[in-house]
Amino acid sequence: MTLLCRLLKQLPTSEHSAEELDNLLAGKLGFLSFTTEVMTQPDVDGVRPYLLVSAGALSEKIDALASLPREVWSSTLLLDADADRVRDVLTQIRIGLEQGFINNGHSAALGRAMSYSSPSAVVCEQLSGVDFYLFLRDLLDHFDERLEGLRTKLAELAGRIFVSDGCLASFTGSDEDFDAYWDAAGDLGLDAGDGAGAGRDALVVPTPCDRHEAFVIPSDICFAASACDPRRLGLDVTGAWAVAANALSYDYLWNEIRVKGGAYGCGFRAAGERQTAFYTYRDPAIDPSIERVARAGEWLGSFEPDEAAFEGFIVSCVSGMDAPVKPYALTKRRNTTYLAGLDPHAREERRAQMLAATPGELRSLGADVTRIAAESPTCVFGGREVIAKSNAGFNVVDLLG
């Protein structure tokens, strides 16, 4: 599905060559993207993957907003895709992933560590993480013999995905633009489909397991992450956790891992109610940081900040929530709230909890932070020598071959 998203817009349609299409999109639309999104669900084991088509245009170009995305998803010549063009796009994706592993390994480590316990993160890994990279690399290694099957699979996927069954539409604009868009778009040219809904409900996700991996990349430093869904541990992550994350990140972890340990960066995240994670960025060693993370809860349990510092932690949390967003970004946030089954009032409640947080409340979280550090699976991306010096018993994987 990721390859389908990346190849749409890059190939000719039944109406335009690839160059003509590129010029049309640049002249008529502000943007057009095809991406995958994986939504966590109220059930900790629930997973809802989506293919997201996003587009924007000026009011006077509403007709193009209705017609061009439809042309791309419905008439791209996937069965006749040019081999060299497909290979080039796939190679660009591979290079981008490899650069991400090398330069932003903490993000890759966070995603991989989450996949050790979260079904939704397993799907994310298959769509855009290490699993996808390994699939892509193998595909490129056997490109000529697999090209015809790839073309057929892409066309079959497009036929199953772009149907009205299960399709949701979201529009951001004035009432006049809304009416004009739907007058032009009609039914979006989507057929009813033949069992697409059943296929969606029948998604089977491999059971997560802690692989305890260390991926070798060309580097003399490492990136590490320990992550989990706090619901697995029976923890309710309130707004006070965000304040605790700030205190841990900019006080304890900063001093212990960055200043004393020599890492370029580090932190603790409490992202909403469905992810908690420790991470390090460009760290010269693995084991010392793991030991310091293990002591984070003990530090928080005896946290005695001065009033000004504590207010600073709260203000930085709340200001992040209060930062103005453009209408499209606000719509994306609301869409995520709906699709992930989140409480629509949770954001306001979380903000109020941040403002009401006290040092005593943060101290009470110390034991839970210790438990998160102890029970969250860990993943590392790093240089071979750095990994070899660790005694943490990682399963070492030569990622880039």
Describe each PLM feature range:
Residues 1-144, 164-173, 223-243, 253-359, ...:
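M16 family metallopeptidases and their MPP-like homologs
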Residues 356-401:
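In a subset of proteins, long, contiguous C-terminal domains/tails are tracked
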Residues 145-153:
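Short linear interaction motifs
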Residues 168-225, 232, 386-401:
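An aromatic/glycine/proline-enriched structural segment found at the starts
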Residues 7-8, 25, 29, 73, ...:
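Hydrophobic, Leu/Ile/Phe/Ala-enriched alpha-helical segments that form helix-helix packing faces
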Residues 152-160, 166-168, 212-214, 253-254, ...:
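Generic recognition of flexible, low-complexity loop/linker segments
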